[in-house]
C-alpha cells in the first residue's frame, strides 16, 4: 500500500514556489548535493528547476551514489530498476543491489543496457550459477569484445567454445567479434557463416565470409557453385554478384533463376547473353513449367522470334508445358499446326488430348492431322470429346467431305463404322440409312454390305418404303459417280 506521502510524490508535477528546502526534504523531493526534484511527464525529471535528465539516467546516478531514497522516488516515477543496478555496480554499492535482488530476478536481463565491459562482467557475476562460458556467450551476444579479449587465454584452452561463439556471433551479426575470432582462433568450417548470412539476407556477413576464405587461400569451385545455387534459388542478386567476384559459372545462376522464376536476376544477366544462350534458357523454362512472366521475359529478349522451332515444340509436347505456345499465339506467332504435326506423329493419344484441351484446339483440327498421319488411335480417342455417339457420327460424317486423301476417308469411315456397330439396335435405326448413302458415295463397299445386312433385319412393314427409297438413292449416287469417272477419263 502506498502512503499518502507516496501518492502525493507520485502525482505531483508542479512544485509551488513557496516550498523551501526543508519542506522538499520532508516530502522526499530533495536530492542531497543536487537539489529539488520535480517530475516532468512519464520519463524525465527536473533538478534544481534547471537541469533536465531522463528518469533512468537519474536512477543510474542515484544507484551509483547508493541513495536508496531517491531510487525509491524515481521508481515511483516509472523509472527502470535495472538502471539503478547498473549505477550501483559502477559505484560498488552492493548493499543497494541486495535490497532489490528479489525484484530483479534474472540479472541477464540487465546486460543489454550496459555499455561498459567492466560493469557488464560485474553484473554477470551476480548470477551465482553462471560460469565463464555463459559470460562469453553473453559477451558475444552484446558485442562486448573487451571481455572476449580478456579471456582469450582461457578460450584457447576450450576449443569447443570457438565454434559455439563463432556461430552465436553469426546469429547475432556481431562482425567485430567474427573478425576477432577468425584472427585469433581457428574455426574449421565457415559453412555456418554463409548459411546464416544467406538466411538473414546479410550481405555484409556474406562478404566477410569470402574475405576469410580468401585470406585462407580457399575458394574451391564446388563451394562457389553451392553458394551460387543457394543464392540464385532465393533470387539474391547482390549475393550472386559477390560470389562471382571469386569465380563460379554464370550458367548455374541462370538455371536457378529460371527454375525459381527470379526475373530480376534473369533480367540482369540476359542483356549480356548471346541469342543461342537465351534460346537454351527458354527450353529450360518450358521444361520447368516456368511462370508466364518468366517466359515473357525470355521471349522479349528474343523479340518473340524463335528459330529453334522443332526443338521448342518437342519440349512443349514432352513436358506438357503449353504456356509458351499461348504466349506466342497472342503475339500472332502461330505454331499450332507445326506443334500438331509433331504431337500427332510422336505422342500418345492421351497426351495429344491433354494438350488439345490446354490450348483449346478444336477436335476437328486434331482429327484431320491424325488422319494425315494415319493415327487411328488419336482419331478415336479425340472423337470421345463428343460424348453422345450419334453426335460423334454426325461430326465425323461432316468431316469426310472435307478430307482430300482417299486413304484418309477410308480410315475415317472405318472409325465411323466401328462407332455404328457399338450402338444399341434402336439407335442404329436412326442412322443406318444416312450412313448407307455415305458409304455408297465414298465407295465403301465392305461397310455398305454390312449395313445392308442390318437393314434386312428391320421390320418390313415399317421400313419397306424407306428401304426402297434407299435403293433408289444409292443407284442414283452410283450413276453419278460413274458419270464423273467416265468424264474424267
From Swiss-Prot:
Question: How is this protein induced?
Answer: Expressed in the late phase of the viral replicative cycle.
Highest taxon above the source species? Viruses
Q: Which UniProt keywords apply?
A: Late protein
Q: Where is the signal peptide?
A: none
Q: Which residues form a coiled coil?
A: none
A family per Pfam: DUF249
Q: What is this protein's function?
A: Plays a role in virus cell tropism, and may be required for efficient virus replication in macrophages.
Q: Which family does it belong to?
A: Belongs to the asfivirus MGF 505 family.
**The name this protein goes by in its record:** Protein MGF 505-2R
Give the classification, highest ranks.
Viruses, Varidnaviria, Bamfordvirae, Nucleocytoviricota, Pokkesviricetes
Amino acid at each position: 500500500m502506498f502512503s499518502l506521502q507516496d501518492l502525493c510524490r507520485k502525482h505531483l508535477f508542479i512544485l509551488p514556489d513557496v516550498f523551501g528546502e526543508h519542506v522538499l526534504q520532508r516530502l522526499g523531493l530533495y536530492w542531497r548535493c543536487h537539489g529539488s526534484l520535480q517530475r516532468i511527464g512519464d520519463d524525465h525529471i527536473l533538478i534544481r528547476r534547471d537541469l533536465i535528465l531522463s528518469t533512468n539516467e537519474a536512477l543510474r546516478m542515484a544507484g551509483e551514489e547508493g541513495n536508496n531514497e531517491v531510487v525509491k522516488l524515481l521508481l515511483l516515477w516509472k523509472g527502470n530498476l535495472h538502471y539503478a543496478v547498473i549505477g550501483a555496480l559502477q559505484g560498488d554499492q552492493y548493499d543497494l543491489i541486495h535490497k532489490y535482488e528479489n525484484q530483479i530476478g534474472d540479472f541477464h536481463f540487465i546486460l543489454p543496457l550496459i555499455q561498459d565491459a567492466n560493469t557488464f562482467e560485474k553484473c554477470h557475476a551476480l548470477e551465482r550459477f553462471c560460469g565463464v562460458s555463459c559470460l562469453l556467450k553473453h559477451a558475444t551476444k552484446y558485442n562486448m569484445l573487451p571481455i572476449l579479449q580478456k579471456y582469450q587465454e582461457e578460450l584457447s584452452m576450450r576449443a569447443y567454445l570457438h565454434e559455439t561463439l563463432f556461430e552465436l556471433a553469426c546469429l547475432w551479426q556481431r562482425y567485430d567479434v567474427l573478425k576477432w575470432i577468425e584472427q585469433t582462433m581457428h574455426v574449421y568450417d565457415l559453412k555456418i557463416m554463409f548459411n546464416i548470412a544467406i538466411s538473414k539476407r546479410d550481405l555484409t556477413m556474406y562478404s566477410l565470409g569470402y574475405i576469410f576464405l580468401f585470406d585462407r587461400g580457399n575458394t574451391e569451385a564446388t563451394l562457389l557453385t553451392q553458394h551460387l545455387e543457394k543464392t540464385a534459388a532465393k533470387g539474391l542478386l547482390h549475393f550472386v554478384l559477390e560470389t562471382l567476384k571469386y569465380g563460379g559459372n554464370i550458367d548455374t545462376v541462370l538455371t536457378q533463376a529460371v527454375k525459381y522464376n527470379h526475373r530480376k536476376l534473369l533480367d540482369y544477366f540476359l542483356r549480356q547473353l548471346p541469342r543461342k544462350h537465351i534460346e537454351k534458357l527458354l527450353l529450360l523454362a518450358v521444361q520447368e513449367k516456368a511462370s508466364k512472366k518468366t517466359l515473357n521475359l525470355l521471349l522479349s529478349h528474343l523479340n518473340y522470334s524463335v528459330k529453334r522451332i522443332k526443338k521448342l515444340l518437342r519440349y512443349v509436347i514432352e513436358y506438357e508445358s503449353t504456356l509458351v505456345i499461348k504466349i506466342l499465339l497472342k503475339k500472332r506467332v502461330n505454331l499450332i499446326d507445326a506443334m500438331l504435326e509433331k504431337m500427332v506423329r510422336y505422342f500418345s493419344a492421351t497426351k495429344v488430348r491433354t494438350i488439345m484441351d490446354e490450348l483449346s484446339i478444336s477436335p476437328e483440327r486434331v482429327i484431320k492431322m491424325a488422319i494425315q498421319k494415319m493415327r487411328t488411335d488419336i482419331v478415336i480417342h479425340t472423337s470421345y470429346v463428343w460424348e453422345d455417339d450419334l453426335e460423334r457420327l454426325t461430326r465425323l460424317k461432316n468431316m469426310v467431305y472435307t478430307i482430300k486423301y482417299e486413304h484418309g476417308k477410308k480410315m475415317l469411315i472405318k472409325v465411323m463404322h466401328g462407332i455404328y456397330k457399338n450402338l444399341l439396335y434402336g439407335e442404329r435405326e436412326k442412322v443406318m440409312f444416312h450412313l448407307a448413302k455415305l458409304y455408297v458415295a465414298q465407295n465403301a463397299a465392305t461397310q455398305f454390305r454390312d449395313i445392308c445386312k442390318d437393314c434386312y433385319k428391320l421390320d418390313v412393314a415399317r421400313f419397306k418404303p424407306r428401304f426402297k427409297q434407299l435403293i433408289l438413292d444409292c443407284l442414283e449416287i452410283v450413276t453419278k459417280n460413274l458419270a464423273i469417272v467416265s468424264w474424267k477419263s
